[in-house]
Amino acid sequence: MAASAVGIITLLAVVLAGPLAWAIATYVERRRKAADGAAEAGASEGQVDGKEPEREEMSGVAYTLSLLGYAIGLGNLWRFPYLVGKWGGGAFIIAYLVCLCFVAAPAYLIEMVMGQYTRKSTVGCFKMIHPRWDGLAYGQALILLMVMAYYNVLLAYAVIYIAGSLVDPLPWAADSKNYFNVEVLNGYDDYIGKGLGPVQWKLALGLLVVWLIVFASLSFGQKILTKVTWVTVVGPIVMLVVLLIRSVTLDGAADGIEFYIGKFDSEVLGDLDMWASACSQILFSLSPGFGAAITMSSHTRPKENVFRTCMVVVVCNSAFSLVGGFAIFSIVGNITFRLNAAGGVLDKATGAMVATTVAEQARAGTGLAFIAIADGMRAFGSGTNAMSVLFFTVLLTLGLDSTFCFAETFVCYVEDYLLVKGSKPAKWKIVGCTCAVMYLMGLLFCTRMGIELLDTIDHYCITYYLLLAVALEAFMFTFDFGWRRLVVHVKLATLGNLRTPLGQDVVPSFFWRLAIHITMPVCSLFLFFYILSTDVVEPYGGYPVWMNGIGWSCLAALLAVTPLGFARSLKSGTGSTLPPLEQDEAALAAAFGIKSTLPPLGQNEESDLAEGATA
């Protein structure tokens, strides 16, 4: 093996592209301000004249890109194909889309509206709606810590592959599955009598690189983060299209695609475990229940059309997963084709070489995306090293987008808490402490049993808590925020915009009300208790008892924090600090020239308001 000049040059180009783009953008912005005579450039930050500092605001494009980056993450290419393979193709996709429409999308919409309405991060938002819900906010802060601890280890895998792309020939050229299992993970063959094992230095070093990138990107506010997001959102979309175009032309790709969308087992649709997996996947991918959408929406402009942005993010996120599935399974089909052409795979029971199937290769586990994409790089011929650098950089940036939002949300928790206590330390200090603690926690997942621990925590934290969180958010919205307030706010916030001069209607009204008030909480709680009943009977994943014990302990911590707000609220007797709904209605009525209070907003809400506008 020798160093690949093409790979090194490509990596340098990728590394230098970001700072160069930032320098050019900064130069242009400074020249524009100088030409305009911007006097506010030297305005001081922090509190002025005893007033609370204004919240940083993002433009509409920056807001949309940030939410796209938050939603479109590594899980779209790491978790989604793995679950499709596990549950046999088309049936899982149907369940995924149903859960998207009736659980995840409604949860995402109400988080975005509540964030924009209150102009506060999750703790402040929930306290404003009613103090009894602040325990849910603290539970979401805790789950952010747990997810950040293991999620960035997946990005460390990408860092290792980027480093491997600088070698010619690629170190995984002979066997991509063996490279992932042995060279990257160095895991155990069995769990009997094993502990976590020693920390793997490659993973630890890769994890350090990831957290240094996060620290550099978050330490200096929304403006820097916005510029970074342009690269980390647009780049993966472009590279995914390139991978898709090349992968569908490979030998055996049709077999992989047929498994992906052509295979349908109606019996699987009756398996509640599959529905639980589908629901947890869309919740993990779109990520309502973490509170990040609330925090990001609190930074958007008051006149931003969050309903339209919600639709854009929901559609683009799912489209990315579905399109990515075509690319991944095309490569899996090609892997199957090549294995069979070479004589098949070894049957451990008989010791004979037997033919393999796409279904068998698709069950490669949580590393399916890394194995498939690594193997797919051989299809680019002389450009293998350059394309490998680019594609694994794409995987890295996909994960970084989500990590940025997770970390930014947690940092906002800390900033808001310290502000209440009368302290306002520099943001880089809070970010630095967060990154350091998360790196140390992440080392647990860099051990020889790290990926098994990762899978366990992912199951108990994500599957359980997100189901519970969205159900509780539905109750909070129904009893303390209200559908009418949402409709009035969206209408008032978008009134007079170029595309919505009469304001944005939340349509179809019947569907959204049905989903938020009924299907979202009922389905979430049903799946929560169903999974609980199965895990109590049989330990998850066949992992050791002590590992499942860690998972149960993490879940117990989350469940213990959540009801604290109810206890404090009952003791203190404090209530909601939301402004009266009549105040919002009066503002909307005044905007339409209606002197009296608006009639109930229902199916005829648009005609009511239009009539007032012409009065």
Residue ranges: model-predicted function:
Residues 3, 81-97, 119, 130-131, ...:
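Transmembrane helix-loop boundary segments of multi-pass membrane transporters
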